[in-house]
């Protein structure tokens, strides 16, 4: 392979390294800004459970190092979540030069909407699901059982719920992409509504902890988001995409001829 052939690859690798470093720096900077408030952040996240615990019950730490490492771990996860827009922008900046004009027009709204939907999903979990789920679980504890949740186990539980609801709220973005690529159409999706409803409960069962309450609270919003995605996908059907591709291809060929 000649030097001329390897030059583009080296350029791309250098650009990729730059974008990865920017992502790492963003996470580290946010983490350093938040680490001082690590205990406050954990208290904020644990508040929905503490409010539902019986009087006199508290959270416990079954590991010697848990009181120190668990809030730090949570703070790092929060830093990753808050830096998501920066990470997505770096991904966009890396792939943008290789995209057609019509693809660039679609990517920016998708990046913005996917970030917003992810945060909305997490907020829905915190403000709606957590109080209902923890209240239900605490009230159904057998008589004589002292409810004292381990702080590390609680973190794993709530992060699983946060991720499940954040990812599930991306359903409209996924549907728009599928219709834009021509893989499916709004008409086909409307015909499959019964299967989607069943699938939403199956996904809720797989993504959430093993209690029917959390599964239902995830499945119902997922189906509603499916309907929202079907509504907006009619503006991004494959025919329009094909026309845009043809126009961009013609523009590229004209530039090449010149």
From Swiss-Prot:
Result of knocking out the encoding gene: Disruption blocks the export of at least five twin-arginine-containing precursor proteins that are predicted to bind redox cofactors, and hence fold prior to translocation. Disruption does not affect the Sec pathway.
GO process annotations (BP): intracellular protein transmembrane transport; protein transport by the Tat complex; response to radiation
UniProt keyword terms in alphabetical order: Cell inner membrane, Cell membrane, Membrane, Protein transport, Translocation, Transmembrane, Transmembrane helix, Transport
Spans within the Cytoplasmic topological domain: 2-23, 97-115, 178-192, 233-258
Result for mutant: residue 211 to E/N: Decrease in TorA export activity
PROSITE patterns for this protein: TATC (PS01218)
All ranges on the Periplasmic side of the membrane: 45-75, 137-156, 211
Effect of residue 103 to Q: Severely retard but does not abolish activity
Coiled-coil stretches: none
Main location as per UniProt: membrane
Subcellular localization, as worded in the UniProt entry: Cell inner membrane
Residues that span the membrane, as ranges: 24-44, 76-96, 116-136, 157-177, 193-210, 212-232
GO cellular component labels: membrane; plasma membrane; TAT protein transport complex
Membrane topology: Multi-pass membrane protein
Induction and repression of expression: Constitutively expressed.
MF (Gene Ontology): identical protein binding; protein transmembrane transporter activity; proton motive force dependent protein transmembrane transporter activity
The keyword Transport is assigned to this record: yes
Protein's job: Part of the twin-arginine translocation (Tat) system that transports large folded proteins containing a characteristic twin-arginine motif in their signal peptide across membranes. Together with TatB, TatC is part of a receptor directly interacting with Tat signal peptides.
Subunit structure: The Tat system comprises two distinct complexes: a TatABC complex, containing multiple copies of TatA, TatB and TatC subunits, and a separate TatA complex, containing only TatA subunits. Substrates initially bind to the TatABC complex, which probably triggers association of the separate TatA complex to form the active translocon. TatC can form a distinct, stable, multimeric complex independent of TatA and TatB. Each of TatA, TatB and TatC are able to interact in pairs without the third partner. Interacts with the signal sequence of DmsA and DmsD.
Family classification: Belongs to the TatC family.
NCBIfam families reported for this sequence: PRK10921.1, tatC
Descriptive protein name: Sec-independent protein translocase protein TatC
């Amino acid at each position: 392979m000649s030097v001329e052939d390897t030059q583009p690859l080296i350029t791309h690798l250098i650009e990729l390294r730059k974008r990865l470093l920017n992502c790492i720096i963003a996470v580290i900077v946010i983490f350093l800004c938040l680490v001082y408030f690590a205990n406050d952040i954990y208290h904020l996240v644990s508040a929905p459970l503490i409010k539902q615990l019986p009087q006199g019950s508290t959270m416990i730490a079954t590991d010697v190092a848990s009181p120190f490492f668990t809030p730090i771990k949570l703070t790092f996860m929060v830093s990753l979540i808050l830096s998501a827009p920066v990470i997505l922008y770096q991904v966009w900046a890396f792939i943008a030069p290789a995209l057609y004009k019509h693809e660039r027009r679609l990517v920016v709204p998708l990046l913005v909407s996917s970030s917003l939907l992810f945060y909305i999903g997490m907020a829905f979990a915190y403000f709606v699901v957590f109080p209902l789920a923890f209240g239900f679980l605490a009230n159904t504890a057998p008589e004589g059982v002292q409810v004292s949740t381990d702080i590390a186990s609680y973190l794993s539980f709530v992060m699983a719920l946060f991720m499940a609801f954040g990812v599930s709220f991306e359903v409209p973005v996924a549907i728009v992409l599928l219709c834009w690529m021509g893989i499916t159409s709004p008409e086909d999706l409307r015909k499959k509504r019964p299967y989607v409803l069943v699938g939403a409960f199956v996904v809720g069962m797989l993504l959430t902890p093993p209690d029917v309450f959390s599964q239902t609270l995830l499945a119902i919003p997922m189906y509603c988001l499916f309907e929202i995605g079907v509504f907006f996908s009619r503006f991004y059907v494959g025919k329009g995409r094909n026309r845009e591709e043809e126009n961009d291809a013609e523009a590229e060929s004209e530039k090449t001829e010149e």
